[in-house]
Regions:
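Hydrophobic single-pass membrane-insertion segments
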Residues: 28-37
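Short N-terminal secondary-structure initiator segments
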Residues: 8, 28, 210-211
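Hydrophobic transmembrane helical bundles of multi-pass organellar membrane proteins
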Residues: 11-18, 41-47
Length: 468
């Protein structure tokens, strides 16, 4: 009898433990509260991660609901989560493998090899053992599934291994804006150095003057002096006022209250949140939330810190929370500091550490010293946060804004060619330089030591000579 009672007690304890475990698992997977505000929830989610996340998603791995929008989300829900974040980028890239290609009945048989209508067919999360560059979870030679006859159709490709399709300067699955044949031919003869080497300049005040929505009644676009600041008498410091006076804000009539006063109650806010910046800098703010620096905020998590990065970072900056003022400062809003010094204050990878001794850095120093024209220097931001054209269709004019989504020109590296490299360099030189990994690590100090034959192949095919 005693053995039976002991068995029943053991069973009850096991059932209770199972119920508690199930409750903890359910809470960890399906609660939508911010995990960072609930340490126990964060620990539960970490414990139940089915595998390491990719470098693109690791920052938001505790915000499970970002991708898993419902409990046991079906394929359509997961696909919707992918396109919610990445859909606009694919449209802008003129995606070469869009959904319409595979819903065309003529291509139906291709789906028997790989279901390219679903992002997760090629990008499976939590599977580090099969994940390669750009979070791809297909074998390197997956192009053969649909393009097995390419060696016959293009003699120049005969004998090339299918694992080389995605080599630098050749092909990308989605974004080929700098790689398609007509583009290669159009820029085939461009020299390594272009005659006009100036980056476009962002003129926010000029843009604001053209926007009917800008509150010009409260902040007329006229310069302000020290006596015209509108901060409470007991609030401003000499340093804060001095910093503000030297900014584009003061020169454009943007007073202290534009950032520090609550728009509803007019109460003074000592430390405005990033939302205050977004009031005027909406494009920059939105793109910041799409990149590595700001994506955690978009997922409802706390700010990114360098300690959370997977790239080498400076130890002294490990716990620095990233927001607008981290790089720009709280009153002087220095775009020059944000363009280089702020970057090198955190990043400690080979490419970043080599910047100061690079030709690009020398051009930047010459511009800062007024020994070269404005727009001729090359800072970290010149390449990784380039000026991007934006058209206000409702007002029928266009302007330039600073793209704060670093990923927009980062991977694959050919995405950088049109908005960045071709501001100064010819296409062939740019393709070769980006394909030279050692040169990239040296921050482009020197000439490329590799050659990408894409342009050569396109020219030979156009002329009807060579292997084409």
């Amino acid at each position: 009898m005693g053995g039976m009672r002991h068995g029943r007690v053991t069973l009850h304890l096991w059932l209770a433990a199972t119920a508690i475990g199930a409750a903890v698992l359910a809470a960890g997977l399906f609660m939508t509260e911010r995990a960072e505000e609930r340490p126990l929830l964060a620990q539960v989610r970490k414990a139940f991660l089915p595998g390491a996340t990719t470098s693109g998603h690791h920052q938001i791995e505790l915000a499970c609901e970002t991708c898993h929008t419902t409990a046991f989300a079906d394929a359509d829900s997961m696909q919707a989560a992918c396109t919610r974040c990445h859909g606009d980028e694919l449209k802008a890239a003129d995606d070469k493998h869009p959904l319409t290609k595979f819903t065309d009945p003529r291509n139906a048989e291709l789906l028997t090899s790989i279901d390219a209508t679903r992002c997760v067919a090629c990008h499976v999360e939590h599977r580090p053992e099969i994940t390669v560059l750009m979070a791809v979870t297909q074998p390197d030679d997956y192009c053969v599934l649909c393009h097995r006859d390419i060696g016959t159709e293009r003699p120049s490709h005969a004998g090339l291994a299918f694992a080389t399709c995605a080599n630098a300067g050749c092909h990308n699955f989605h974004d080929n804006r700098a790689l398609y044949e007509d583009f290669l031919l159009r820029h085939a003869a461009a020299p390594a150095q272009l005659p006009r080497q100036l980056r476009p300049l962002a003129r926010f005040a000029e843009t604001a003057a053209m926007l009917p929505t800008y509150p010009s009644d409260r902040y007329p676009l006229v310069p302000l002096d020290r006596t015209q600041h509108d901060a409470p008498a007991e609030t401003p410091t000499v340093e804060a006022i001095a910093g503000w006076l030297g900014t584009a804000h003061a020169r454009a009539g943007v007073n202290c209250g534009a950032c520090h006063r609550d728009s509803t109650t007019s109460a003074w806010i000592a430390a405005p949140a990033a939302e205050a910046c977004a009031t005027c800098h909406a494009l920059e703010s939105a793109s910041f939330g799409q990149g590595k620096h700001g994506m955690r905020g978009s997922a409802g998590l706390g700010p990114m810190t360098p300690a959370q990065a997977r790239l080498p970072m400076r130890r002294a900056a490990a716990d620095t929370a990233l927001d607008c003022t981290t790089c720009h400062g709280a009153h002087d809003f220095s775009v020059r500091r944000a363009a280089v010094d702020a970057c090198l204050g955190c990043h400690a990878d080979r490419h970043s550490l080599a910047y100061e001794d690079s030709p690009h850095a020398e051009l930047w120093r010459r511009e800062l010293a007024s020994d070269a024209p404005e727009g001729s220097g090359v800072s970290c931001a010149t390449c990784h946060m380039p000026r991007t054209e934006h058209r206000y269709r409702e007002y029928d004019f266009k302007t330039w804004f600073v793209q704060h989504n670093q990923n927009d020109t980062l991977r694959p590296s050919e995405k950088m060619i049109r908005p960045v490299c071709q501001s100064c360099h010819g296409l062939s030189f740019a393709l070769d330089a980006l394909a030279d990994t050692e040169l990239v690590d040296r921050n482009f100090a020197g000439a490329p030591s590799v050659h990408v034959p894409s342009i050569d192949m396109a020219v030979a095919r156009e002329r009807g000579t060579g292997t084409e």
